[in-house]
Amino acid sequence: MASKALSSFTAKPAVSLLPHGVSSSASPSVMSLSFSRHTGGRGVVAASSTVDTNNMPMTGVVFQPFEEVKKADLAIPITSNASLARQRYADSSEAAINEQINVEYNVSYVYHSMYAYFDRDNVALKGLAKFFKESSDEEREHAEKFMEYQNQRGGRVTLHPIVSPISDFEHAEKGDALYAMELALSLEKLTNEKLLNLHRVASENNDPQLADFVESEFLGEQIEAIKKISDFITQLRMVGKGHGVWHFDQMLLN
């Protein structure tokens, strides 16, 4: 029947890769592949493959894809709930990513509370409100970036609970602006410690791709944020709690 007809051919090396003057009889057979095509099917199937790689000369064919894909760590999952993309991604790396997602969301939540406080009509420091709103958005974007990476590596995103932040940042001695900025610096340093821990997990699991992701996307940016907020704290300490805070706020606003 036409639907069951087969077309077959044998593929053998057509070009010798041996050095000039060396007889091909001195080298073992490299590869012989037979392919069968079902005219009613959807592809080509490799029916057989005979490869002797142990005695293969260095000038011969080195990469044998049909043999190497048989390795256990390259096996493709057949269950629907298993990731097809996952490769060399340790469970501890997956868990550490989920923890970092939680860190970023928690810091974003605190900054959002600061934004709401400084936007009050009886506080009215619009520059600080703007700064902490932007900081909150940035931390949320970091969390989403980690979530995207988790999915790229074939991990499962698990969102952990977020702690409710305080809503008032008044401080009798320091004033609200300096107090909030010092708290922000502590949060940025804490985030940096968490990122370094994530990088350490990647190194322990021999995962250069995760290590590169943390280095290229977060570590440099983190020290820039620490320096920026440190400068703000120094300036706020110089101006004190009075009228100078308003001028500092205008600097952030404009």
From Swiss-Prot:
GO cellular component, one term: chloroplast
Keywords associated with the record: Chloroplast, Iron, Iron storage, Metal-binding, Oxidoreductase, Plastid, Transit peptide
Role noted for this protein: Stores iron in a soluble, non-toxic, readily available form. Important for iron homeostasis. Has ferroxidase activity. Iron is taken up in the ferrous form and deposited as ferric hydroxides after oxidation.
Protein's UniProt name: Ferritin-1, chloroplastic
EC number: 1.16.3.1
A GO MF term: ferric iron binding
KW Transferase (keyword) present: no
InterPro entries found in the cross-reference section: Ferritin, Ferritin-like, Ferritin-like_diiron, Ferritin-like_SF, Ferritin_CS, Ferritin_DPS_dom
UniProt-annotated binding residues for Fe cation 2: 139, 188, 222
UniProt cross-references to SUPFAM superfamilies, sorted A to Z: Ferritin-like
Domain Ferritin-like diiron: 87-240
Region entry Extension peptide (EP), spans: 48-86
Gene designation per UniProt: LSC30
Family: Belongs to the ferritin family.
Cell compartment(s), UniProt: Plastid, Chloroplast
Binding site for Fe cation 1: 104, 139, 142
PANTHER family (UniProt xref): FERRITIN (PTHR11431), FERRITIN-1, CHLOROPLASTIC (PTHR11431:SF122)
Known partners and oligomeric status: Oligomer of 24 subunits. There are two types of subunits: L (light) chain and H (heavy) chain. The major chain can be light or heavy, depending on the species and tissue type. The functional molecule forms a roughly spherical shell with a diameter of 12 nm and contains a central cavity into which the insoluble mineral iron core is deposited.
One of the GO BP terms on file: iron ion transport
Reactions performed catalytically: 4 Fe(2+) + O2 + 4 H(+) = 4 Fe(3+) + 2 H2O
Coiled-coil regions listed in the entry: none
Presequence positions on this chain: 1-47
